[in-house]
């Protein structure tokens, strides 16, 4: 029971620290670092005694923070991968004005890409203007840009 109480206190403290980050809070990578480090320190405190225990707490905190950071970064990366794959698919095959959607089932983030009519630029590349809408943590962001088809078939953002 003693360890469960410690875990609850540490998670509450981590939540309060995250809330101090202001509007939007801490990103997933920062949250993962904080929670992983806290959990690692708690786990490390269960080993050794005296200076040995102190070393175990430090090592546990460091390893937990590294692992938590990587897990948080992977989640953000998944959103970017889904958005990029959807952009490529929309620019290559979607009719003008038709939105193609992506959704990350792990965190609920989602977005759409809506391309306009394709045209050839002055170097002969096919290009399309597009609108991209992304909703992360319930907050919507919209961006406009132009992408051109490269010789390898990939679309590259040019502005």
From Swiss-Prot:
Q: Which residues form the signal peptide?
A: 1-19
| Positions of S-diacylglycerol cysteine lipidation | 20
* Keyword Signal attached: yes
Membrane topology type: Lipid-anchor
Its chief place of residence is membrane
Q: What keywords appear on the UniProt entry?
A: Cell outer membrane, Lipoprotein, Membrane, Palmitate, Signal
Which compartments does it reside in? Answer: Cell outer membrane
Q: Which InterPro entries match?
A: Anti_2, Bact_OM_lipoprot/Surf_antigen, Gly_zipper_2TM_dom, Surface_antigen_Rickettsia
Q: Which PROSITE patterns match?
A: PROKAR_LIPOPROTEIN
Q: Please indicate if the UniProt record lists Nuclease as a keyword.
A: no
Q: Tell me what organism the protein belongs to.
A: Rickettsia bellii (strain RML369-C)
Q: Organism's domain of life?
A: Bacteria
- Chain residues carrying a lipid of type N-palmitoyl cysteine: 20
What is the name listed in the Swiss-Prot or TrEMBL entry for this protein? 17 kDa surface antigen
| Recorded GO CC terms | cell outer membrane
Family, as annotated: Belongs to the rickettsiale 17 kDa surface antigen family.
PANTHER family in the cross-refs: OUTER MEMBRANE LIPOPROTEIN, PTHR35603
């Amino acid at each position: 029971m003693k360890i469960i109480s410690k875990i609850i206190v540490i998670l509450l403290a981590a939540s309060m620290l995250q809330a101090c980050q202001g509007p939007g809070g801490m990103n997933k990578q920062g949250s993962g670092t904080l929670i992983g480090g806290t959990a690692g320190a708690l786990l490390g405190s269960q080993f050794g005694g005296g200076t040995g225990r102190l070393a175990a707490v430090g090592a546990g905190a460091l390893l937990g923070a590294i692992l938590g950071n990587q897990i948080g970064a992977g989640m953000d990366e998944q959103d970017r991968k889904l958005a990029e794959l959807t952009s490529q698919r929309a620019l290559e095959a979607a009719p003008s004005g038709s939105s193609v959607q992506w959704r990350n089932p792990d965190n609920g983030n989602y977005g759409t890409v809506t391309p306009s009519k394709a045209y050839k630029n002055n170097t002969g590349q096919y290009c399309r203007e597009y609108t991209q809408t992304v909703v992360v943590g319930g907050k919507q962001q919209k961006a406009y840009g132009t992408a051109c088809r490269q010789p390898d078939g990939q679309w590259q953002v040019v502005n």
